[in-house]
């Protein structure tokens, strides 16, 4: 997998004295690199979704840690990064915790997923921005009707579990 600096060794963990935390621009570049070639359900470059979620976090007053988590929110879930690569990255522990909180686990009930998001400081804002982009009517319109209906129901259920108003 690709490391944050594009090389083969991750910069040291934030706070370890090994390296300064990655900047937002470095996190964005890393996320774009590890998701290169991926597309969303509508066939659009996946980086467009990452940028939209990051924009949503920024527009909602998110912290730099939340902004970094927005760029990386699907990296572990999609297999673009391993949990170990994330752990070794020069990122604040809060960012790593948020990324792991919003990473769905195989076979995990939605209630457990939502509870983890709610229990992790900062993760709810990242998930809110993710859901907002996922449920965007213009984005959903590009999908076939059965997929659109299934995803609309899925996103509405998750919003309810997270206590988010419709």
Q: What annotation goes with each model-predicted range?
A:
Residues 2-166:
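Active-site helical microenvironments for divalent-metal-assisted chemistry
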């Amino acid at each position: 997998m690709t490391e944050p600096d594009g090389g083969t060794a991750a910069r040291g963990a934030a706070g370890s004295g090994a390296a300064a935390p990655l900047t937002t621009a470095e996190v964005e570049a890393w996320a774009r690199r590890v998701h290169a070639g991926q597309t969303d359900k509508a066939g659009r470059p996946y980086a467009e979704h990452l940028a939209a979620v990051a924009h949503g976090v920024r527009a909602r007053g998110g912290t730099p840690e939340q902004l970094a988590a927005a760029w990386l929110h699907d990296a572990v879930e999609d297999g673009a990064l391993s949990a170990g690569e994330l752990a070794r990255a020069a990122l604040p522990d809060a960012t790593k915790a948020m990324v792991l909180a919003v990473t769905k686990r195989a076979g995990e009930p939605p209630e457990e997923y939502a509870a983890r998001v709610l229990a992790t400081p900062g993760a709810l804002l990242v998930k809110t921005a993710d859901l907002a982009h996922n449920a965007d009517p213009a984005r959903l319109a590009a999908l076939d009707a059965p997929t659109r209906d299934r995803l609309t129901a899925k996103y509405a259920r998750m919003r309810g579990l997270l206590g988010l108003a419709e």
